[in-house]
Amino acid sequence: MSKRRLAPLTFLRRLLFRTLVALVVFWGGGIALFSVVPVPFSAVMAERQISAWLSGEFGYVAHSDWVSMEDISPWMGLAVMAAEDQKFPEHWGFDVLAIEKALAHNERNESRIRGASTLSQQTVKNLFLWDGRSWVRKGLEAGLTLGIETVWSKKRILTVYLNIAEFGDGIFGVEAAARRYFNKPASRLNMTEAALLAAVLPNPLRYKADAPSGYVRSRQSWILRQMRQLGGESFMTRNQLY
């Protein structure tokens, strides 16, 4: 093969390598920076903002009001763990048993796909990654999840998650959600309110905290039972999450 034919292939390989290096540096820097600095924006916020602009909604502003864990009701952290990831204090980013159960379920029910993402994985997806499903994205998700689990404390992961999670159309973070739905700061959320917010997390654009469907109410009740079974507020302090 001539040098002329090799040149474009060599260029593409170098470009791909440099792009990967740049992304690793970017994401690695983000993990290090956000271990101590409040997160100002997330990938999901950027996606919603761009979508709004393309739709002509120029008044739409995606943002969250950052609050520390000390300014968030302990019920809220407990509620999202009860709803999404009860083994959060124990695992290193992945719940192997939940993944196995999800795979078995999905083989039997192709029309109803069940996920098994931990809070750590959800934090990575919300903060760093684009929407969609692909092996490349899954690989990046796994690497970044290990990254935050290594660099951040569990308390930090939970804090970031609660500050960037989407709780409704244009409502990002638990502080904005508490003020929008209950007219109070996140620090004053009670057990029932926290469970309601956690109940919409599977699909916050479909399920509404201000107009909860029967499914949302049923899920809220289930979350409340799980919160009690975990041990209530003591679960947070026992695992150094508050």
Swiss-Prot record:
Pathway listed for it is:
Cell wall biogenesis; peptidoglycan biosynthesis
Which Gene Ontology MF annotations are present?
pentosyltransferase activity; peptidoglycan glycosyltransferase activity
At the top level of its lineage, which domain of life is listed? Answer: Bacteria
Q: Where in the cell is it found?
A: Cell inner membrane
Tell me what topology the record assigns in the membrane. Answer: Single-pass membrane protein
Q: What class of enzyme is it?
A: transferase
* Summary of the function given for this chain in its UniProt record: Peptidoglycan polymerase that catalyzes glycan chain elongation from lipid-linked precursors.
The protein depicted here goes by the name: Biosynthetic peptidoglycan transglycosylase
Gene from which the chain derives: mtgA
